[in-house]
């Protein structure tokens, strides 16, 4: 029999407790039980006046509102406030009653501009939640996985301008210059002079009058801090690069945000400085991080770099670099035709140049497979930090390393997929790097806290079940009781 009573209870008056309306296994209840949110007061105490002004909005509520937004992947703050108005669990989490007015959607933005801008508040919140994970001994930092993903910026790809920008200095530049000059002196060469041009002369190609290299970049007029990123063969967008490190259990250990046009190997140092002291034994990364500088940095710090095979960039039909054998004793290369390529110089990029004799190569039967140079001289380069790259190759072939590298898809790549699908990290509505760092920090904080809350609840449930079993078998099954105690 069909019942029609859908509209009968709409105008009923009831008395209830807010706490009774939120299920015991609701995610927000589990999160609220997992961490004491009062730590936020200590972080923002210097942002508020102690003895004058109107009473402010509770800082904990102020942080919890965007936390709800990123936890549930709500697209905007305006939509988040609308959801809070009608969602009992959201109101309970914020400490609001049913008749309390929800803060205006612009409240958080104004507080961010006036109080939290140019501070590391959101990174401190991320670190505080990460400390809770450490407290429960859930994190194993011995194996760390590093990768980067791109987040589409709030910028129209057609609204841009081109500008001349100075090439940014590499993090290893000073050390590399020193070792280049030492290497040149060992080979009887003069140290390289600093690049300085006459200011009266016009800039040379790729350079400037002050010696700094320049390049032409595309800059968004909407969000100048984002970077022009090539997404596929036929699509370019302005984006941010989010670099992340996690352990083998999927706990996020650190992050950094950079413009989307910067290569992962250039921005690695900013992330590495945040995580290098947590006890890393092995660091796993993709081919984008396979550079001599990163290999040297990790090995000098006692960390095992696990980097994949990187195919040679040789043209089809030509000998690969691996077919030229390096003789360490005589410091030379031997070509496939058993001819010597002798040391010539060490360039500014840190590469030793080994050249063949053009007169000998002119009559070589393999010339067309070797070089296209007009003088028939073959040049093979070797970085002064190449021994570190060779060490990485030895590590890659060690037993068990292939299986460890395969865990990337189960750890850091899964995190990116979860963040984009469930937490709104596929694109951003924020403009500027600082706001993007806030979004990423809170998103990763809520991902860690969500996982922590579920594990604490699951552990508590198992503990209760274990106690019930222990009571049941205490009098009747001594052997079973002993087994349970050993678990």
Set out the residue ranges of the language-model regions.
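Short arginine-rich
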Residues: 91-95
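Generic alpha-helical segment signature
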Residues: 11, 24, 37, 58, ...
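Anion-binding and metal-coordination hotspots
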Residues: 4, 66, 73-86, 96-487
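A short, ordered amphipathic alpha-helix with a cationic face
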Residues: 4-8, 54-56, 98
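Basic, short loop/linker segments at the boundary and entry of helix-turn-helix/winged-helix-like folds
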Residues: 24-67, 72-73, 384
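Hydrophobic alpha-helical membrane-insertion signals
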Residues: 1-29
């Amino acid at each position: 029999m069909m019942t029609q009573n859908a509209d009968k209870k709409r105008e009923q008056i009831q008395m209830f407790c807010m706490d009774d309306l939120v299920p015991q296994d609701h995610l927000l209840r589990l999160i609220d039980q997992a961490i004491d949110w009062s730590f936020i007061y200590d972080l923002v105490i210097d942002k508020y006046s102690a003895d004058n002004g109107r009473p402010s909005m509770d800082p904990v509520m102020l942080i919890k509102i965007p936390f709800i937004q990123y936890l549930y992947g709500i697209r905007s703050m305006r939509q988040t406030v609308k959801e809070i108005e009608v969602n009992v669990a959201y109101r309970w989490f914020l400490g609001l009653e049913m008749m309390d007015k929800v803060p205006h959607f612009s409240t958080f933005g104004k507080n961010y501009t006036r109080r939290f801008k140019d501070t590391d508040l959101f990174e401190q919140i991320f670190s505080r939640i990460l400390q809770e994970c450490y407290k429960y001994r859930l994190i194993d930092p011995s194996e760390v996985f590093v990768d980067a993903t791109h987040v589409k910026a709030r910028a129209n790809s057609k609204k841009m301008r081109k500008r001349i920008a100075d090439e940014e200095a590499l993090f290893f530049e000073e050390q590399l210059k020193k070792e280049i000059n030492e290497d040149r002196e060992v080979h009887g060469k003069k140290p390289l002079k600093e690049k300085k041009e006459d200011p009266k002369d016009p800039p040379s190609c790729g350079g400037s009058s002050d010696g700094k290299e320049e390049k032409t970049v595309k800059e968004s007029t909407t969000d100048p801090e984002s970077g022009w990123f090539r997404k596929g063969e036929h699509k370019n967008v302005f984006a941010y690069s989010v670099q992340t490190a996690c352990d083998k259990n999927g706990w996020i250990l650190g992050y950094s945000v950079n413009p989307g046009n910067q290569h992962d190997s250039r921005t690695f140092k900013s992330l590495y400085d945040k995580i290098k002291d947590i006890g890393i034994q092995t660091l796993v990364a993709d081919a984008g991080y396979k550079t001599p500088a990163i290999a040297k940095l990790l090995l000098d710090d006692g960390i095992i770099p696990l980097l994949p095979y990187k195919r040679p960039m040789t043209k089809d039909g030509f000998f690969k670099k691996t077919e030229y054998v390096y003789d360490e004793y005589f410091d030379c290369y031997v070509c496939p035709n058993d001819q010597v390529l002798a040391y010539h110089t060490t360039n500014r990029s840190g590469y030793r140049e080994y050249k063949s004799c053009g007169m000998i190569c002119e009559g070589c039967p393999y010339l067309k497979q070797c070089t296209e140079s007009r003088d028939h001289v073959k040049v093979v380069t070797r970085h002064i930090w190449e021994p570190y790259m060779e060490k990485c190759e030895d590590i890659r072939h060690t037993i068990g390393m292939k299986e460890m590298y395969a865990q990337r898809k189960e750890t850091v790549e899964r995190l990116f997929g979860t963040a984009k699908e469930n937490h709104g990290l596929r694109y951003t509505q924020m403009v500027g790097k600082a706001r993007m760092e806030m979004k990423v920090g809170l998103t990763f904080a809520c991902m860690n806290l969500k996982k922590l809350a579920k594990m604490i609840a699951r552990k508590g449930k198992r503990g209760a079940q274990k106690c019930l079993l222990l009571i049941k078998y205490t009098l009747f099954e001594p052997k079973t009781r002993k087994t349970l105690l050993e678990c």
